[in-house]
Amino acid sequence: METNTLLKQIRQEHAAAFTHSGKFHADDVFSAALLLYLNPEITITRGNKVPEDFEGVVFDIGRGQYDHHQKDSRIRENGVPYAAFGLLWEALGTEILGEELAQKFDEAFVQPLDNNDNTGEKNELAALIGNFNPTWDAGGSNDEAFFQAVSVAGM
């Protein structure tokens, strides 16, 4: 039986999530890929402002529980700051992999992406995801590029 309220919210029928529009980073993309892994039917919307009546998971925008763009953003004991992906993984990882494997995955995969997002420290996977962002003169939408990147991240 699921005791994780966030996991229940993600897995419910007609589940929804919201994140920022515009340029995206690996933490946004892997957050969306994680949500889609847990519920392939979840609707993920991007926008400039979270609608007041939105009832779903909000990440990397809106100053909520899964947004790290705040003055009092959390930092791990080892000094690596959380980004959206790390905040979601912290809440969901143990349910998915168990405590020991979730911690190892956090250290090896999530933390480097979080660190890249917060500090700009070089990360090849983050650079790959960043390359999906359209150039200023390219056709197509940021949303289309975002969901292409999410598709690659979810492979």
Annotated model-derived regions:
Residues A149-M155:
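Short, intrinsically disordered, charge-balanced linker/junction segments flanking boundaries
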